[in-house]
From Swiss-Prot:
The chain crosses the membrane at residues 10-30, 50-70, 92-112, 113-133, 153-173, 183-203, 215-235, 244-264. It catalyses: a ubiquinone + NADH + 5 H(+)(in) = a ubiquinol + NAD(+) + 4 H(+)(out). GO terms for molecular function: NADH dehydrogenase (ubiquinone) activity. Its EC number is 7.1.1.2. Keywords: Electron transport, Membrane, Mitochondrion, Mitochondrion inner membrane, NAD, Respiratory chain, Translocase, Transmembrane, Transmembrane helix, Transport, Ubiquinone. The keyword NAD applies. One of its GO terms (biological process) is ATP synthesis coupled electron transport. This is NADH-ubiquinone oxidoreductase chain 5. Disulfide bonds: none annotated. Its main location: mitochondrion. The lineage of its organism: Eukaryota, Metazoa, Ecdysozoa, Arthropoda, Hexapoda.
Length: 265
């Protein structure tokens, strides 16, 4: 059991140290207005190439810092909360996979790589919700997975629509999206995807169901990953939504969700 406890503590210290480092770096990026855009050519075959892009600015670094901070605290809490669990190794690895999927989503300015992180969140979320392997967990996991599939379909439609413009790097088209009705459709689809991840009405039913997972998982799912993924996407597409009636619609839906959550509490 000492080995398992050390395994949790190693993950805690590792994530906490990276979180503090990223927070300090994000402050430097914010004050000096630095942005790093990195392209990594994974495969090149004659005229075809597969390029992975990463965007490092103060916003992405600060979000990664907060995600790692909350995740490290959840793992530290799991050290004692799940001390008697025989599968705690598997549990910690699933949580770390969750964090990696979220970081993949945050640093990607490309809708394809965002979809990889997005589906990674959905898959690991399903594995965590059904962790206890009983009928209640299976039903909750299926509800969580199916609710988030709607957002996946919306993101796939946005990817298909961006084929018209020759690139999936949405970061280059944000100014164009403000004045182009067709590009606003992409913003609307991304907003629909964010609503499913953030459990807004009418997709909020999966959030109480996710409590079938172990308590640390529920805290992680609710606070630092799934909900934050939707919020982060909306922040990136903020310029598009602010010039459209969808912003008022989103405000209404979020207000209704808060009201319903208050009644439920």
């Amino acid at each position: 059991m000492n080995y398992l406890v050390n395994y949790c503590k190693i993950s805690f210290y590792f994530l906490m140290s990276i979180s503090l480092s990223l927070f300090l770096i994000s402050l430097k990026f914010l004050l000096t207005d630095l942005v790093y855009f990195i392209e990594w050519e994974i495969l090149s075959l004659q005229s075809m190439s597969i390029v992975m892009t990463f965007l490092f600015d103060w916003m992405s670094l600060m979000f990664m810092s907060f995600v790692l901070l909350i995740s490290s605290l959840v793992i530290f809490y799991s050290n004692q909360y799940m001390e008697e669990d025989y599968n705690i190794n598997r549990f910690i690895l699933l949580v770390l996979m969750f964090v990696m999927s979220m970081m993949m989503l945050i640093i990607s300015p490309n809708l394809i790589s965002i979809l990889l992180g997005w589906d990674g969140l959905g898959l690991v979320s399903y594995c965590l919700v059904i962790y206890f392997q009983n009928v209640k967990s299976y039903n909750a996991g299926m509800l969580t997975a199916l609710s988030n599939r709607i957002g996946d379909v919306a993101l796939l439609l946005a990817i298909a629509w961006m084929l018209n413009y020759g690139s999936w790097n949405y970061i280059f088209y944000l100014d164009m999206m403000k004045n182009n009705i067709e590009m606003m459709i992409i913003g609307g689809l991304v907003m629909l995807a964010a609503m499913t991840k953030s459990a807004q009405i009418p997709f909020s039913s999966w959030l109480p169901a996710a409590m079938a997972a172990p308590t640390p998982v529920s805290a992680l799912v609710h606070s630092s990953t799934l909900v934050t993924a939707g919020v982060y996407l909306l922040i990136r597409f903020n310029d598009v939504l602010m010039n459209w009636w969808m912003a008022q619609f989103l405000l209404l839906v979020s207000g209704l969700t808060m009201f319903m959550a208050g009644l439920g509490a």
